[in-house]
Amino acid sequence: MKENFWSELPRPFFILAPMEDVTDIVFRHVVSEAARPDVFFTEFTNTESFCHPEGIHSVRGRLTFSEDEQPMVAHIWGDKPEQFRETSIQLAKMGFKGIDLNMGCPVANVAKKGKGSGLILRPDVAAEIIQATKAGGLPVSVKTRLGYYEIDEWKDWLKHVFEQDIANLSIHLRTRKEMSKVDAHWELIEAIKNLRDEIAPNTLLTINGDIPDRKTGLELAEKYGIDGVMIGRGIFHNPFAFEKEPREHTCKELLDLLRLHLSLFNKYEKDEIRQFKSLRRFFKIYVRGIRGASELRHQLMNTQSIAEARALLDEFEAQMDEDVKLEL
């Protein structure tokens, strides 16, 4: 194996969860500006497309990163071990520091085809994929869930994953069936850690699910002795979630992050071709907590260009109180 960056991380370390159509190079840089995590994962990259001579063009943008984001981990999915093998070799050449395998995506058209969380029901294939991915020489990690249908599946499934000698396991503390409709099962963290200690003490354990910020993550790490904390949806409510010394933030700071997002979208649009409308999902992150925010969001949703969005921000900020504090 090439250098294992996982062993050099602080304890506990913090990761921005991979999220489809969210954690691209643009949003990762915005989060980094607000408060940087220790590790970044890419969006989801399909191994079948990556290995196809034509499909590669449709996914390459998902793998765009800059050196200031290191250590960068490529998050990939599929169900053909040979495609994971080839993908891993190419990802190593591209400069990634690690590869993370998606065995937790609950979306129906993924899971029901035996991919993502569907691999929980195909443990032999999951093991083959893990071993095949090691061909690239990068540390291999897995992101998965407690089970597919029932919570009680966790012990057999995670025991099987731990036996594969992986660098890190990120466990979303819900089943595929639960999606994100119930509270994460924090009550299982201790038992999962005990299983890890018994089966694979050298595999790092990262928890994910309902963790809103670094403060909460530190409390869980101290209580249970886990190695890492992954924050996903919490970043939508608080882009400063990874802040080491939390402080009050102003509405203007959020709008400044939106301006940065717009600028970076322009900067990287040649590397990662996306339509302007893909930005709309982000507006609610930055525009809130101030009088007129709802109307501004509505207006931004109807814009068709970066220039239009900037003009609206200029007009809005000319009339706002820059010192209004946020309640995150």
UniProtKB/Swiss-Prot annotation:
Top EC class of this enzyme: oxidoreductase
Pfam families for this protein: Dus
InterPro entries: Aldolase_TIM, DUS-like_FMN-bd, DUS_fam, tRNA-dHydroUridine_Synthase_C, tRNA_hU_synthase_CS
Any GO MF annotation of the entry: tRNA binding
CDD domains with a match to the protein in the record: DUS_like_FMN
Coiled-coil residue windows: none
Cofactor(s) required for function per UniProt: FMN
Residues bound to FMN: 18-20, 143, 208-210, 232-233
Keywords attached to this entry: Flavoprotein, FMN, NADP, Oxidoreductase, RNA-binding, tRNA processing, tRNA-binding
Enzyme Commission number(s) of this protein: 1.3.1.-
Highest taxon in the source lineage: Bacteria
Catalytic activity: a 5,6-dihydrouridine in tRNA + NAD(+) = a uridine in tRNA + NADH + H(+); a 5,6-dihydrouridine in tRNA + NADP(+) = a uridine in tRNA + NADPH + H(+)
Catalytic site: 105
Its biological purpose: Catalyzes the synthesis of 5,6-dihydrouridine (D), a modified base found in the D-loop of most tRNAs, via the reduction of the C5-C6 double bond in target uridines.
Family statement drawn from the similarity comment of this UniProt entry: Belongs to the Dus family.
Family matches, as PANTHER family: DUS-LIKE FMN-BINDING DOMAIN-CONTAINING PROTEIN, TRNA-DIHYDROURIDINE SYNTHASE
Protein name per the record: Probable tRNA-dihydrouridine synthase
Organism: Staphylococcus aureus (strain MRSA252)
